[in-house]
Amino acid sequence: MTKLKRTIAVIGEGITEKYYLKSLQGIIKADIKPIIPNHATSMFDLEKQIKKAIEEGYNNIFCLIDMDNKKQGRNRDNYLKLKKSYHDKRIYRPKKGLDTYIRFFENERCLEIWFYFYFKITTKEYLSSDELCKELEVYGYKKTEDFFKSCQGLHRFLESQGGNLDFAIKNAEDSIKSKDRDGRDYTYSEMADFFKSIERK
């Protein structure tokens, strides 16, 4: 029988998620294992990682989803199909000792909108992730692995530049409320729900 682990598997789509999750050590109580698929935009790879985490006995699997490449066409269709299969679902296999809850958390355009919410709220539509990242440059942010390695932790860096996690959570909540109210499908983050799903210290 598989023994359930207390760790949470968090599946991101790239190195930004990997380094941000690592930077949360000491901020949250949960023991998080970041998982990054080989091909960031592949729904096949994402599903493969979800299935692997289920079989490894994680009782919570959280997927951080960048929406910038899932807005239309086949990418959108494949994502919606995957989301329908796994989002907000419980996988219960008592014979294997498996009891797993899976949830997706979307960021539009990408995780950087969550970083922006550390500082400000916005409903501006960004036409590309690069456009959004450029707005973060005023705070010294760079979307490069060299920067992620040298900034002494993304969360700590964002707060050192005047950002605030509680402010980001409030802004993310407001972004969802205004999205639903206005019928908007852009510039929002579900990371407030992510932090509600894990315990902060």
Regions found by a protein language model. Name each.
Residues 1-5, 18-36, 47-60, 67-201:
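C-terminal accessory helical subdomains adjacent to catalytic cores in phosphodiester-
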Residues 7-11:
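Conserved beta-strand elements of the Class I
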